[in-house]
């Protein structure tokens, strides 16, 4: 890994400034919740005057080294580690596991961080945790991963998948035990992690977002537009939304926009055609941040049927856009959606319940609809990125979370 000039920072005193190394198995240009959180966290820390370094897979195998990159409008040093494409997945790249520790040693020698913040325990995070612990560097770990989330890309036979999940949680436990503090995005995710490992005292710390970056138009809509934002993969259960659409009154003329891309796109486009929905369902593929926000602003509601969300930044983005949320009653989504207040929950995979919930929103009076919009806007304030940054700064310094 070669060196590169460190971006200049301002407005901090030397005693307050920290050199932070964030270890990620997924980072820009990847589009997913874990990568987006790491980007916002890193940019927010740079804005506060800290010296932030990222260790992440290279964008292409030969494009390795240390580069000054602009992330969320802020410059920081990103140490790109030689990686390979995992072809069963539509974008995933990975560092060879047996090379993780040597690469970690090299980056640690170069950066000399005050603290490590791991965003994954699988490859890069594992290497950093093992080598960082040897050097007695303070480690904070955030878990974004459920082994269940990666089952579809392992190519394992069905009967081996249960063993893989058990093995995955054991490996997570071995790495997370090296951290002085372990966090997850929500209380439900923290409880789940504690049940699945021997970790205790896991702290719920929201991924956070800056609500002012999103535009909410409060008021009834002229068109009935459903939107989903996220990876187009199996665990997102987008097919449930398509089946629910067939149960809606055709007079409502409901359209559905899927913002994002993934390995299930062709299958879902085929399903939409088979269900007679091809003219009302639009898959955008990858879009810019500006386009994503426009789709949210113009929608009537946000629908998410996913069964494996540890928080869901996309749902928070929809809330910041003033949308009622219809979400599966699974994992951490009930943490964001308060049934009957800023949206409705439905039994996971139950397209009939989902259709009923969507109908309820479409049939609301303008006043009822606006009340639900304002409830989303109010609820998302608890997830302000500055609160998240405050907590992590404290954890980096060893200050207990309030």
Predicted regions and their residues:
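Conserved acidic donor-binding segment of nucleotide-sugar-dependent glycosyltransferases
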Residues: 339-340, 344-351, 360-366
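Short hydrophobic beta-strand element within catalytic cores of glycosyltransferases
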Residues: 324-327
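A short, well-ordered alpha-helix in the C-terminal region of glycosyltransferases
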Residues: 367-382, 394
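A conserved mid-protein helix/loop that constitutes part of the nucleotide-sugar donor-binding site
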Residues: 36, 224-247, 252, 256, ...
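N-terminal subdomain of nucleotide-sugar transferases
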Residues: 2-69, 74-80, 387
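Donor nucleotide-sugar binding/catalytic pocket of nucleotide-sugar-dependent glycosyltransferases
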Residues: 56, 162-216
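Aromatic "clamp/platform" in nucleotide-sugar-dependent glycosyltransferases that forms part
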Residues: 307
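Short alpha-helical donor nucleotide-sugar binding micro-motif in glycosyltransferases
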Residues: 108, 176, 286-287, 294-299
